[in-house]
Amino acid sequence: MFQNSVKNGVYPAPLQSLWAMVAIITSLHFAGFKMPYSLTDKILTLLPGKTLEWQFTACTIMAIVIWLTVIYTLRYTLKLLLMYKGWMYEQRGKNRQVSLKTKLWLLAVKILSSGGNKPLLYSYQGSLPRLPLPPVEETMKRYLRSVRPLYDDEQYTKVEKLAEEFRNGIATKLQRYLVLKSWWSSNYVSDWWEEYVYLRGRSPLIVNSNFYGIDAILMSPTQSQAARAAMIIHTCLQYRRLIERQELEPILIQGLVPLCSWQYERVFNTTRVPGVETDKIVHYNDTKHIVVYHKGRYFKVYIYHQNRILHPCEIEIQMQMILEDTSAPAPERTAWANARTEFFFKGTNRQSLDAVEKAAFVVALDDIPYEFDENDPSKLDQYGNILLCGKGYDRWFDKSFTLCFSTNGRIGFNAEHSW
């Protein structure tokens, strides 16, 4: 929302501080106090007149300039403070001894972070420091240290020689490129990692990239597939609303050091669209339906009524209707991209594909139970295999995640890795 974007843009200062600044500058002007360099008077000379209205306009402009200057000063000060890593190596525990440097740092961060308003989910994004670029020598040392257990002495000597050739050769040129990229990018590696490690991969997602999550295996809240599906779907929609309204609190280490919240943005309403050479991730801003798969058929299920999320009981009715009512992409990426272009370009196929790709997420109502037995580990292996692969055609592997529900009320999910 626009209001949240403005609040994030001025954090750590509260938005109300603008009106306080306007009141202070206006009061000083009409009280006869001269601003430094007579800036208010200089602004007034650029305006059409010197009436009370134009004087107030000049004061407002001056207040906005000072307010923005203070905000950016606070933000970049906080960014510099968050670059300090010494707190990681301090002692932990009740009788810990914390250095004076870290104590002063903690106090400064706390003062700047508590700016009078509660931070939204993305409030700290503009204050996070850039990912530091390590020198080539340090990178090579860490690489050699990481591979040493994998090689015998003869093989490791060859690797050392190759590393030395790389360090004395093209490494310097590549490092310069990374330095340039780090100047205009907050993270010099994330976009390349996403594209070249994930999106350019041509192997099927089913076992090469996607991962799965499993239910709390020692708990069984209900044996009803429709009821469990309805409750989890409703909970996911509430969680999505928290993200969209930025009401979810950012993660703070020790309640003070913020972590990046950017990845929350693509949890829902996101799909991976195949391409011949590289895929792309598409995120939709507003989606009011989900897609449910059951026994070879896909159902478009609306999850809102008059801008209200459906109650669990209302969703359960729809799930039960689907269960009582008497093909997904898993091929190689280039083949799927060509099929998508050829067969899903227009008409009903295009509309059906849009319904799936623009869904908040996908739900699979499986027609088998997910079983767990402490005395039979193979059942847990089968449970995980079902969530990871299904039958090969009953998961939409390109969606950000697919919720899977069994006939005995257990759940799990299959998630696409690149987002």
Explain the meaning of each model-derived region:
Residues M1-K399, T407-G409, E416-S418:
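Long, Pro/Ser/Thr-rich low-complexity/intrinsically disordered regulatory tracts in eukaryotic proteins
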